[in-house]
Amino acid sequence: MNTGLPSQIQVIELLGGEVARAGYEVEDVIIHTWSQPFWITVLADGDTVLARDIIATLSHSVSALLDGLDNIVDRYFLEVSSLGMGRPFTSEKHFRRARGRKVELAAVGRIPADRSNWGDVRRHGDVGDPRRPRLCGMRDPAIEIMKAIV
């Protein structure tokens, strides 16, 4: 069935260069075919915060690129956003991008007092408090982090 929409891979390939020129990368593209008009969500992220003015500029660029496709419907909603504060840490780049930001961590068990310290993300590997540890303790075998959210 032809929905009149490009595939997720086509959108990522199409937008990757434009988003990279702005200093960011396309983290994900979600194409919602259940709504009318269709909804396309582009999630971008980078080492600097994706501010509103940058999102607005990217939205215009992304829209122009999508409108230039042959297989795009006449009407669609476009959302350009970032995972922002709810982003899970799933790779080293997420830790790097969170540098200097406050985080919430859930540790398995207790973190010994000699390894706890209040603080924000400093560098990959900091040790911290069970309520808000600094993130270099990840490699410490005595500390197992269950969940980390910026």
From Swiss-Prot:
Required for maturation of 30S ribosomal subunits. Belongs to the RimP family. It comes from Mycobacterium leprae (strain TN). GO terms for cellular component: cytosol. Transmembrane segments: none annotated. InterPro entries: Ribosome_maturation_RimP, RimP_N, RimP_N_sf. This is Putative ribosome maturation factor RimP. Signal peptide: none annotated. Keywords: Cytoplasm, Ribosome biogenesis. GO terms for biological process: ribosomal small subunit assembly; translation. The gene is rimP. Its main location: cytoplasm. It comes from the Bacteria. It holds the Pfam family RimP_N. It is found in: Cytoplasm. The lineage of its organism: Bacteria, Bacillati, Actinomycetota, Actinomycetes, Mycobacteriales.
